[in-house]
Amino acid sequence: MSDHTIPEYLQPALAQLEKARAAHLENARLMDETVTAIERAEQEKNALAQADGNDADDWRTAFRAAGGVLSDELKQRHIERVARRELVQEYDNLAVVLNFERERLKGACDSTATAYRKAHHHLLSLYAEHELEHALNETCEALVRAMHLSILVQENPLANTTGHQGYVAPEKAVMQQVKSSLEQKIKQMQISLTGEPVLRLTGLSAATLPHMDYEVAGTPAQRKVWQDKIDQQGAELKARGLLS
C-alpha cells in the first residue's frame, strides 16, 4: 500500500491504516479458511453417511444369506462401516468446533474492521482539512478580491438605500451569492481517483475489504454480548473435550 507520492504529513496516518488493513485481512483470511473447512467437512460427512447407508442394506442381506456366519469379508465390511460411523461423528464434532471458530472470527473481524474504518477516516480527515486550508489560503485571492469589490460597489447609496424594503446588507448579499454558486459547483463536482494519488491509494470508502459487516461486536454493547456468548460456548466445548 506504500506510495512515495503521499505527502509527508500523511505518512504516520498511512502507516496506521496499513497496519489496520493487514490485521483485518489476516482475520478475513482465517474466516475464509474456516468457512471452506466447514463446507468441506459437511461434504465429507455426507459422502460417508451416504456410503454407510448404501452398504448397510447390502451387508445385512449378505449376512443373512450366510446364515449369520461372519466371513472375513463380512467382518472387514463391518469394521469399515463402524469406522465410517465413527468418522461421521468426528465430522460432527469438527463442525461444532469450526462453527465456534467462525463465530469467534466474526467478532474479531468486526473489531479489526472498526479499527480500519477509524484509521481510514482519520487519514481522509487530515487530507481533506489540509486540502481545504490550502485552497482557502492559496487559491481564493481572485474570489476574495471580486467579493470585496462587489461589496464596495453595493455600499454605494445608489445601489442599496438603507431602510428600503427588501434591503440586504452588501456583505450578506455577496456571501449569499458566493454560497449559492459554490453549492451548485459542489453538486456538479466529480472527483476522479485517477488524478488523486491519496484517494487512489485509500479509496473514498473504507467498506472495500471482505468480512467487514457481521455486526456482532462492532459496538461496546454488542461486543459484551458476543464475548459472553463466546465464553459460554467455549466452556461448554471444553467440558465436552472438544477444545483444549
Swiss-Prot record:
Print the keywords alphabetically: Late protein
The protein's job, in short, is: Although P4 acquires its capsid proteins from helper phages such as P2, it possesses the ability to assemble capsids that are only one-third the size of the helper's capsid. The sid protein is responsible for the assembly of P4-sized shells. It forms a P4-specific scaffold with icosahedral symmetry on the outside of the procapsid-like particles.
Descriptive protein name: Glycoprotein 3
Q: Which organism is it from?
A: Enterobacteria phage P4 (Bacteriophage P4)
Q: What is the lineage of its organism?
A: Viruses, Duplodnaviria, Heunggongvirae, Uroviricota, Caudoviricetes
